[in-house]
Amino acid sequence: MYEGIVQDLIDELGRLPGIGPKSAQRIAFHLLAADPVDVRRLATALTEVKEKVQFCRSCFNVAQSELCRICSDPRRDPSSICVVEEPKDVVAIERTREFRGRYHVLGGAINPIGGVGPDDLHIRELVARLADGTVTELILATDPNTEGEVTASYLARQIAPMGLKVTRLASGLPMGGDLEWADEVTLGRAFEGRRVVSA
């Protein structure tokens, strides 16, 4: 244990995902030794991201205005929506340059054990987006793990009465993995080989 504010910093850093006690300590001491200008720049970036970043009113991706840059881009194909769990998944798919449609970020996956049900996700908003008839294909790009599969199956059943083409990314993604860790080639091939999902 360190004194006062040093320990407070270590404790706060340790609350971040993927940062254990040792990493938190290393980061804290790096910040203590860093140039004050660099530390102020980091503090400003943290403050600004909380003050200026919001969620897109259409797709729930991160945005600095009402619509994210993808939803406001007229070159994107409005007839195809790719459903992902988190904004980081949008970034992973965008890196492939395979998809030119729009996205819908659910904000997680169905996980009854974790207390996350369909009503806790942006599923109602997705159904509302599909109601106007513009969308012809819905691509389910949830993570290839149990929660992602449950979520994809639930969505396929909910969307089936609308008569849309519903596809799922092809295999090649490891079961139990996360989209954000897939390389561009694997994710691109999964996109190319997506399969139709039946309810």
UniProtKB/Swiss-Prot annotation:
Signal peptide: none annotated. GO terms for molecular function: DNA binding; zinc ion binding. Keywords: DNA damage, DNA recombination, DNA repair, Metal-binding, Zinc, Zinc-finger. Pfam families: RecR_C (PF21175), RecR_HhH (PF21176), RecR_ZnF (PF02132), Toprim_4 (PF13662). It comes from the Bacteria. May play a role in DNA repair. It seems to be involved in an RecBC-independent recombinational process of DNA repair. It may act with RecF and RecO. This is Recombination protein RecR. It comes from Frankia casuarinae (strain DSM 45818 / CECT 9043 / HFP020203 / CcI3). The lineage of its organism: Bacteria, Bacillati, Actinomycetota, Actinomycetes, Frankiales. The gene is recR.
